[in-house]
Amino acid sequence: MTTLSIFHQNQPEQAQTVVTDPDTIRNKLSAHGVHFDRWATRDLPADATQEEILEAYADEVARLKQDWGFQTADVVSLTADHPQKDAFRQKFLDEHTHSEDEVRFFVRGQGLFYLHFGDQVYALLCEKNDLISVPDGTRHWFDMGPEPEFTCIRLFSNPEGWVASFTGEDIASRLPRYESLAGGA
């Protein structure tokens, strides 16, 4: 279940608020410029190709490109048996920003976005059918868990703008990781 847990950065051991209602999640994130939505499920085979996935969601992707100016879309997928899963997980576990929006739609599986706003951290467990757009410049990090299992559509205005710029802050190491917040989901 999609879950938003809100932490105070000085009390990272306990969430102040936990929300599972999609409309409430949408409203809380929107207050910080983060777009959250849910798309209808599409029937896709487990081994669907990038082309099949993009075709299944062609209308939604085209709408985002038109409304938000995205130029390209691709599909990223990671499974627990990937030989570089640990390196991929580590790559985005530290707080960073991007010079363009980070947009992900979860075709299957799940992942945990942490969004740092002032003295609060919003931990959003995204699941199948969730769309999130993190505005450029937003301090955040992503945890796919020790046994990743997800497929996402990514949208870009400029893929070079998506390079992570790390903040050097240690806040990500003080918050509960995927293993704690996903609850074995």
Swiss-Prot record:
GO terms for molecular function: acireductone dioxygenase (Ni2+-requiring) activity; acireductone dioxygenase [iron(II)-requiring] activity; iron ion binding; nickel cation binding. Fe(2+) binds at H96, H98, E102, H140. Its EC number is 1.13.11.54, 1.13.11.53. It comes from the Bacteria. The record marks E95 as: May play a role in metal incorporation in vivo. The record marks R104 as: Important to generate the dianion. Pathway: Amino-acid biosynthesis; L-methionine biosynthesis via salvage pathway; L-methionine from S-methyl-5-thio-alpha-D-ribose 1-phosphate: step 5/6. Belongs to the acireductone dioxygenase (ARD) family. This is Acireductone dioxygenase. The gene is mtnD.
